Amino acid sequence: NLEISKVKQYLKLNESGIETPATVAVLGQENIIEAARKLNIYPLITKHNRAGKGLGVQLFQNEEELEAYVNSPLFESSVDGITLLQAYIKPSDGRIRRSEFINQKFLYTVSIDSSDGFQLCPADGCQIGKRPEQLETSEKFQITEPLPDGRREAYENFLKNAQIEVA
């Protein structure tokens, strides 16, 4: 199922001609360092194969940082035991772009400030306890320019072919 496996998502995106960062799927915590050596790309991020909101996403500048994390009590395994190692593509302005689709049609693109980490759910800005004026001045999430037409069409076609309604 594409909706619960990032590995399958990346494979299908690549098969459809949509480029994704270099990614390796690793089964088991004990295999991560060796897989990272073979991938040999830094900086890199780790992420859970099955998770959302940026859970499990960590950035590493070098092998020493990765090894310290993997061998520490802070390491969190994905529910399926698969950790993804992925080349980190640093956004020029420090903001990650995420596009949302409903019924296989483009809805909007949001620009997200990732300087505080990768747990990036826009709904988190609406947590109880925040006052409305705090939300008004938040720069963390901003609706931004839409995808270029060619890229939007490629994603819409991918979603249609994969029969995914919401992405």
Residue spans for each PLM region:
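Phosphate-binding site of ATP-dependent enzymes
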Residues: 58-158, 162
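Active-site nucleotide/adenylate-binding loops and adjacent lid/helix of ATP-dependent enzymes
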Residues: 2-95, 152
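Conserved active-site loop/cleft motifs that coordinate metal ions or position small ligands
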Residues: 166-167
